[in-house]
Amino acid sequence: MDPSRYGRQQEWDNNSAPEGYGTQHDPNHRFGVSYDDGYPDERLMRDDVYNYPPGHNTLGDLPQSRKRNYEENYPSELRRQEKPYIDSNYAADYYHDSEAGSRNGHYRDHEHERSSRYDGCDDYSCNDNNYRSKNYHHSRDDGREKDYDYTRRSYDSEYERASVRDGSRKSRDPQDRERNSRDREWDSRDREWDKRCYSRERDESPHKRYEKSRSRSTGRGEFSRSRSPRGRSHGRSYREDSYEGDHWNESERRREYEDRHNQDHFSATPSATVVVKGLSMKSTEEDLYQILAEWGPLHHVRVIREQNSGISRGFAFIDFPTVDAARTMMDRIEHDGIVLDGRKLMFHYSQPTGRAGVSRRQEHASRRSYGGSRNMIVPTDWICTICGCINFARRTSCFQCNEPKTKDSPSADVGLSNSAAGKRISETGPTHVLVVRGLDEDADEEMLRYEFSKHAPIKDLRLVRDKFTHVSRGFAFVHFYSVEDATKALEATNRTALERNGKILRVAYAKSVHGSGTGISAPSHSNNLAAAAIEAATFSQQYDGVGWAPKEYNTGEKQNTGGQAQGVGEIESQKGTSAPQSGYVWDEASGYYYDAASGYYYDGNSGLYYDSNSGLWYSYDQQTQQYVPCPDQNNESKVTENQPDSAKKEKSSQQKVIISAATTPNVEKVLSLPDAVQAAAAAAIASEKREKERVKEIKLASKTSLLASKKKMSNVLTMWKQRSHETQIQRPSPSLGDNPPTVSAEARSSFSTGQSMGKLKSDVIIAKERSTSNHGVSALTTAESSSSSTTGGTLMGVMRGSFGGTLGGASSSASVQMPPILPSASPASVSVSGSGRRRFSETPTAGPTHREQPQTSYRDRAAERRNLYGSSTSSGNDVIDSSEDLMGLRKGSSDPTPFPPGVGGRGITTSTEVSSFDVITEERAIDESNVGNRMLRNMGWHEGSGLGKDGSGMKEPVQAQGVDRRAGLGSQQKKVDAEFEVQPGDTYRTLLHKKALARFRDMSDNN
């Protein structure tokens, strides 16, 4: 230490520093904590820059007894670094508030703080006297050691800087290491004590913690930090780099949160409804009834659960009979607390939401996202003034019309659009609709109507139910005729219990969904609701093809222009008349006044009311206040029928407009806005279903007609192909004569009539046409039966083949009666039927018509091979083989006119057919006409020479050999040699070796 720069310190009596000792070295302006190992900033001057006058002791020195004990316990050398340290439990408060005071520029008198520290009469020490008495000496010793460590580094900084520049840093001595270990030990003790203190504060009641936080905030305001920049830098580095700084900041944030929570808790307005939080998943309403039974009977306890799973969400609402009962319970559990299922419950009064339709959680989340201020206005969705579209709060321009947001753009939130500061629901003004909350699941409309009709007549009442379970959702809307009636009912029913189940009703004015910013202008609130109902009803009926019928105007209006002008004038005059009641609004579509609640149309000229359900006109009786039906409405139609045409025309010219309103299922049911919207959605869904069904029917009809037309065309083509085949391919026979049989015009007409039937016709028409077709076919067969038997057989085969597909496919009962074909038919029919079964060895018949028809159908080669080479199973069963050939040819062959089963000589086989086929031998199979032979010849090969470049290859063609060892079921394998057979003692390796040798031996033998 430089004695010329730092003089000898004074004793504790005067507690003053010499004039050369700057404020940056004053121990009273440094924190009593362990600083980091950094050194003072070399860029700062170490001269006496801040010349502040020394502090004065305003409250006097310590008592002599305290001073004597202090001098005996501590050496005089260390007393000059001593400063009043606060206990570690409140170090965070000290750092936090002293920093805030330094930023604001308020520096306090530290000598006053020191004297008040040891005076023992301040509020701070009195509130926590027990704790200070236990930890007084520890905190002082801890602060002395920590401050001495920092002071030593500050005083020896010149020497240490020189050592660093020379490159030889001086190591710490054992005393320094011992001092650091002792500091760490005290720090760990302080942290443990802080944890115990925090757990003790959590066990205390909220009111005590609130009072203690107030006293603590008063005490901590007496401390401040140093004004020197050097001391300030060290304090900041400690808070940012050390573990203790993070711990203090975290505890400070936790304490501030508890203070705000306690302030909100105690500042909440007491109410008869209490919210319980902290419930377990298995806690039920019965458990809450039991633990709260000592505070009297409870009106209702409801545990909030998930809508889908039914699991408890962890909180519940408890309704007390009165506010005093709820306050008594809250005061009692404030000190004792309640534990249920091993969890401590938290109670607080139920508070209403801040805005209409916005929950408290959403409000807090929005406020946190925009800075967290309690008094700030959270941005809300806004409505475009150009197109009336609702935009999100973050948008600066409308997403529909791209117009920028202006200051005049109204808020989409009704509660905020009416007031700039976001008023409560009750501050927006009364309405004639009340919302009733606090209902249970068993509530119904009759109960509410009985309760509210005592005070004022009810115009409409709607209990909101779940759309899937139809269970009450806990609230309802009551519509009165006037605001005065609604106000009267509100004052009489709010916070009252129902007579049936004792539920406490929470009644308030309802908010209209159509506020000032929605673009709907109407003279009153009821007109807004009625206009919305008409709009919803119009929307629903435009998709309903049954409900809203088009208006019918008289035919003379289109021809008579004057009549048109007169009708328009009547409508304008009717529109100019005033509405009979407040619920009626002008409907441009019908030309009448319409009441959405009753469903009546009002004619301003005649003063009559039209019921859209019954189609009758009524007059309103003011005395009885009832609707009286007009007389002679049913007889009007009969009289009109008996009148002559001139009278009918005259009456039709006098009629104005005939409307057909939407029918409602129940006359007594009142049509409200939500009902109209729901009806619109249902009508839209129904119309969509009908449209889908109509499209499906159209597709099915088109598909059916397409199939019918394809089938018709195929049958017609088959008939004409058969006719052409009969005239070109049929061989002449002595029994047939020169002229082949042809189909008559009557047969063709009956055939066309039979084939033109489709599935789209009705059953009656189909039956008639079937009978006509059958009659035509029978007449045809009768007319042709007089000719030769050969001609009749051929023609019957043609007709049966033509009519069998259509008539048999249409109905199994409709069949054509044909005489059976006997085996004794003439050979001509056999030749005709056999002419279509041409084998692959036959040369095709030369004919221009036949060449033009390509062979695209399936060819049964297996049947051809069986007929050519024979089969072991076909001997003695020629009838079956013949029928198989006919079936294969019926599916498709080179013959364009295949015969159906049983027609054209079925079961008749001759030996001439089999002998007409040419047997292909091995010599003929590979001859000059072979494709491979021709390819080799084109490449220069000739018979007798070998293959390859020099002709040394094979000369004979490869003969294919069939392998019958494993060809099909029942085949016997070649017997293996005895040396390759598997013996009982052979291993797997030996087995593989034997199989490989046997396979090699077999291949060698085959080659």
From Swiss-Prot:
Bias kind Polar residues: ranges: 631-645
Residues covered by the G-patch domain: 928-974
Job of this protein: Splicing factor that controls alternative splicing of the developmental regulator ABI3. Reduces splicing of a cryptic intron in ABI3, leading to a decreased in ABI3-beta transcript. Regulates the splicing of the receptor-like kinase SNC4/LRKL-2.6.
Tissue: Ubiquitous with highest expression in siliques toward the end of seed maturation.
Compartments, record wording: Nucleus
Gene Ontology CC: nucleus; spliceosomal complex
The protein, known as: SUPPRESSOR OF ABI3-5
InterPro entries per UniProt: G_patch_dom, Nucleotide-bd_a/b_plait_sf, OCRE, RBD_domain_sf, RRM_dom, SUA-like_OCRE, Znf_RanBP2, Znf_RanBP2_sf
Annotated Pfam families: G-patch, OCRE, RRM_1
